[in-house]
């Protein structure tokens, strides 16, 4: 199978390259931003014919300009979008518009433009396969089920080691404290988003757009052994468990969840202690934003959330605010912003620019 990887030098991108090698698929091309050393490693390992460097065209290979040219020339069967941040939205849009099945790791695509991308997906008769432990687990659980059998979806959160800790302790957390997630190997930003539960807010919104079910509950399962669950109308519950290895999600998306291919170790249940803990939305009010976004599709709400989160996480990294202020500032800006309707997906970049400008203006005093 011919595969194009967008964002190939990031954490998910590198794991995708590893899975492609193990499955003996063909990497026809990739894009990246500025990690030239990692890009050279991929070129030496798999020698794809087409490379697009977003930061400097002199590193391109057989491509002059943009993603459209990269897709047209490389002619992939599927596209993996592992681009980080809202820049990945355009990549998802182009992939679906080109009638390519999309293997999606970019969260912002669905959080900001889920309704719009779903419309394009239907029009082009393509499929979006998630690359994420929770959504991949749900996809696997739901693939042979009918919607009228489903009562509720459950996604789990680890709590990143800080769930229900004393406020005094949370206030003292530093950027370096949060970099080492207890269960997963992740980048810096997603490690922080895991600790604040913002990542779980994103995942609730993503789950709705992927499965068209609004009744979604988050629960804490500290070991990250159980990734998701489905509660059926007969009140039975099916849980999904795998090792804490994102390559399972990548392998599953590439094989369309056939459950026959194996590139990760089996789960040793005897070494795990599994316990579910309820999340109090009054103690963690950030979750209320997720359900507000679900009630108001085709609006700027998802964009506002991702933009303000990106901004305050950077403030935290620069030690301008403490850990607890991250979600305080997010909630304050989100609930006071005059949200707008998104009529056209091509408006999104302009709307994001305006949102980011409003955020920078409001919180400039914190960045001095």
UniProtKB/Swiss-Prot annotation:
1-deoxy-D-xylulose 5-phosphate binds at residues 107, 133-134, 158, 181, 194, 199-200, 203. InterPro entries: DXP_reductoisomerase, DXP_reductoisomerase_C, DXP_reductoisomerase_N, DXPR_C, DXPR_C_sf, NAD(P)-bd_dom_sf. It comes from the Bacteria. Mn(2+) binds at residues 132, 134, 203. Pathway: Isoprenoid biosynthesis; isopentenyl diphosphate biosynthesis via DXP pathway; isopentenyl diphosphate from 1-deoxy-D-xylulose 5-phosphate: step 1/6. It is an enzyme of class 1 (oxidoreductase). It catalyses: 2-C-methyl-D-erythritol 4-phosphate + NADP(+) = 1-deoxy-D-xylulose 5-phosphate + NADPH + H(+). This is 1-deoxy-D-xylulose 5-phosphate reductoisomerase. The lineage of its organism: Bacteria, Bacillati, Mycoplasmatota, Mycoplasmoidales, Mycoplasmoidaceae.
């Amino acid at each position: 199978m011919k595969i194009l990887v967008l964002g190939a030098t990031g954490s998910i991108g590198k794991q995708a390259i590893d899975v492609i090698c193990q499955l003996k698929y063909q990497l026809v091309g990739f894009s990246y931003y500025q990690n030239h050393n990692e890009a050279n490693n991929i070129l030496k390992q798999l020698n794809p014919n087409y490379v697009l460097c977003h930061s400097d065209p002199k590193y391109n290979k057989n491509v002059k300009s943009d993603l459209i040219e990269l897709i047209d020339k490389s002619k992939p069967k599927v596209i993996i979008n592992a681009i980080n941040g809202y820049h990945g939205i355009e990549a998802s849009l182009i992939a679906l518009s080109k009638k390519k099945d999309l293997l999606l790791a970019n969260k912002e695509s669905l959080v900001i433009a889920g309704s719009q991308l779903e419309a394009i997906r239907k029009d082009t008769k393509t499929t979006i396969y998630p690359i994420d432990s929770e959504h991949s687990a749900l996809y696997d659980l739901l693939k042979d089920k009918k919607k009228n059998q489903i009562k509720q979806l459950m996604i789990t959160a680890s709590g990143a080691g800080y769930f229900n800790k004393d406020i005094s302790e949370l206030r003292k957390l530093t950027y370096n404290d949060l970099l080492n997630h207890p269960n997963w190997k992740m980048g810096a930003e997603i490690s922080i988003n895991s600790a604040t539960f913002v990542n779980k807010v994103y995942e609730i919104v993503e789950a709705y757009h992927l499965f068209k079910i609004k009744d979604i509950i988050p629960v804490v399962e500290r070991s990250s052994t159980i990734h998701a669950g489905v509660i059926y109308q007969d009140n039975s519950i099916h849980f999904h468990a795998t090792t804490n290895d994102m390559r399972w999600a990548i392998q599953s998306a590439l094989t369309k969840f056939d459950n026959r291919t194996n590139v990760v170790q089996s789960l040793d249940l005897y070494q795990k202690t599994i316990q579910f803990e309820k999340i109090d939305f009054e103690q963690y009010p950030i979750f209320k934003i997720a359900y507000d976004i679900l009630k108001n599709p085709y609006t700027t709400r998802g964009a506002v959330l991702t933009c303000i989160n990106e901004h305050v996480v950077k403030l935290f990294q620069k030690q301008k605010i403490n850990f607890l202020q991250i979600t305080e500032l997010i909630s304050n800006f989100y609930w006071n912003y005059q949200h707008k309707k998104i009529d056209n997906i091509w408006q999104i970049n302009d709307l994001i620019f305006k949102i980011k400008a409003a955020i920078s203006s409001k919180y400039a005093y914190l960045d001095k």
